[in-house]
């Protein structure tokens, strides 16, 4: 078998990432050696591979679904937004510079097609099947000429295309039809059919519409996936990241102790790796809320200032909203505060930034004895250490170099009183350390909260991935899906007018 498939979507957040992961997990359970691939990802949620390459966090999650180690070839182009109109371009795991959207789509993107096709060929030469994820919609007619992630990669590699639509939003039939009808004939010939995502109710009520869609397009529907809570793992930061006010709470089990523990995460601009708090939200009795007002910190037992692609901008935002003063008051009252990566940097005394914001000298919040200087060379590394008497693993992704001048050691950073800071993403996924940290927070907050002794974040993640595989196995036509991956799109698929504009 030397198969492949592109999972496209009618919109951003249609479910491409989780459907791709589900197909990967289903295939690996059939004994197929499979890998994920996304030619170009725009995300602030990233991950560091074992050899120090930066890729999208979603592709790392999909690699886990495949039970393989993630590599840079699985996400050769990563765009990390730094503002409304520019992004850092990460090529094969290494940053190569900042670029405006106009500059990127004006020619640079098209020149990267060869690079992404080479990465895909590398994977296809190693694995039995490669399941590719598209981005946004393949029918973005203004971007088709320079597309390297949807029909550009499908046509370049001869991949069949499965279009995913989120029926929970409404309008899925128009979205399916319109997506195909706006593609050029050569692109339409690769679109094999559709997959309905997030359906609620009786599937028999949907079947007449699916039959009509087949009559209109000549393309079949490969499955109807039911709506399932708790499967938005390692989400990208498109539509889902309107996080202000969002609550993440464990659905695993009730609290072990008498009290819950309330965690407030400051929803700073350009928030990166907000998945850091998923391990907290998986703990029974921990309620995580994303906040943007100082009064929302009042009843929080722990405040987290998360990572951000714009440390200085986040610092300004905290000050403008009154959150900086509220955090400083908490620290003075010895109420728990945790800064991660950019959040750690802004808790320090001084920031010198001629790289990210080019703001030069900026005063931090002064809560930790740390001085930060931004370096053009990005730190990308896996980290292993110990804190609170427990082993910890994490990873670092940052331009800021921190000089710690005091306080008590805490991972790579420090702590003063009940204020902690570290560059390490992912540290809270280490179960023993997470429990020890939550015990400290609960004691400082006066809460009768007890961490569950047996919560394994890695095991919960595996359960989630298995549930995604189950969705495909039980609710998709897996025989037809297998043929599609192995043999490509059916021959003779009809053209749906009007096609792509000239």
Swiss-Prot record:
Pathway: Cofactor biosynthesis; adenosylcobalamin biosynthesis. Residues 260-433 form the GATase cobBQ-type domain. InterPro entries: Class_I_gatase-like, CobQ/CobB/MinD/ParA_Nub-bd_dom, CobQ_GATase1, CobQ_N, CobQ_synth, GATase_3, P-loop_NTPase. The active site is at 341 (nucleophile), 425. GO terms for molecular function: ABC-type vitamin B12 transporter activity; catalytic activity. GO terms for biological process: cobalamin biosynthetic process. Signal peptide: none annotated. Belongs to the CobB/CobQ family. CobQ subfamily. This is Cobyric acid synthase. It comes from Streptomyces coelicolor (strain ATCC BAA-471 / A3(2) / M145).
